A protein has these predicted regions:
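Short, small-residue-biased leader/transition segments that mark boundaries at the very start
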Residues: 2-4
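ATP-binding/phosphotransfer module of carbohydrate and carboxylate kinases, centering on a glycine-rich
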Residues: 8-193
Length: 193
């Protein structure tokens, strides 16, 4: 759980306040100047898409800021944990407004005190929903490595990488699949006792 980590834009505030439903509503209100609006994120996404009247740029910025703050928190998490990032929930309908800033954060740079530039995340970050990036992710940087003392070679892939994707299952299905897999693992564990 990264929810109690500090927020990039508001260091004394928890990150959840920058990535939750209330954040999208708050940022839209602040940027549009309509702080008393009654829009929900679905409405704000429709405004961004031009399907509903409202401030299009404020709507896009609300989702872009969510992506930036989420990307910052995810960059910290993937530094500590090796795994894929799967984003789910209703908010994913606004993917095209969230992902550019989220990926920018994950692919961002940092500097040492002497000015040396480093990647924010040690791994190469791939958008697995992008067909070309998925192919690159799957291919990696495989090369032949000679096994010392033999004539044999093994495949070696030195590329550290991480993938980011939007869940295709939806929250309810993902929970069901996870519960089913857990139940099967528990049954298998009982059989082995």
């Amino acid at each position: 759980e990264m929810c109690i980590r500090d927020s990039k834009k508001m260091p004394d505030i928890i990150v959840e306040d920058g990535v939750a439903v209330r954040a999208i509503k708050r940022v839209y209100g602040e940027v549009s100047g309509d702080v008393k609006h009654a829009f929900e994120p679905k409405d704000i996404c429709e405004i961004a898409d031009g399907k509903r009247p409202g401030d299009v740029e404020a709507a896009k910025q609300a989702f872009a800021e969510l992506g930036e703050i989420a990307g910052d928190a995810m960059a910290t998490a993937v530094t500590l944990v090796d795994g894929l990032i799967v984003i789910g929930g209703g908010i994913t309908a606004a993917r095209k407004y969230i992902m550019p800033s989220l990926l920018k954060e994950l692919r961002g740079k940092m500097h040492t005190i002497t000015g040396e530039e480093l990647n924010r995340v040690q791994m190469k970050v791939y958008d697995l929903d992008n067909e070309e990036e998925f192919k690159e992710f799957a291919k990696g940087d495989q090369r032949a490595l000679k096994v010392y003392g033999t004539d044999r070679y093994v495949a070696y892939d030195p590329q550290k990488r991480i993938g980011v994707m939007i869940s295709k299952l939806g929250a309810s299905n993902a929970i069901s699949v996870g519960a089913y897999a857990f139940a099967l693992s528990q049954l298998d564990a009982q059989k082995q006792q």
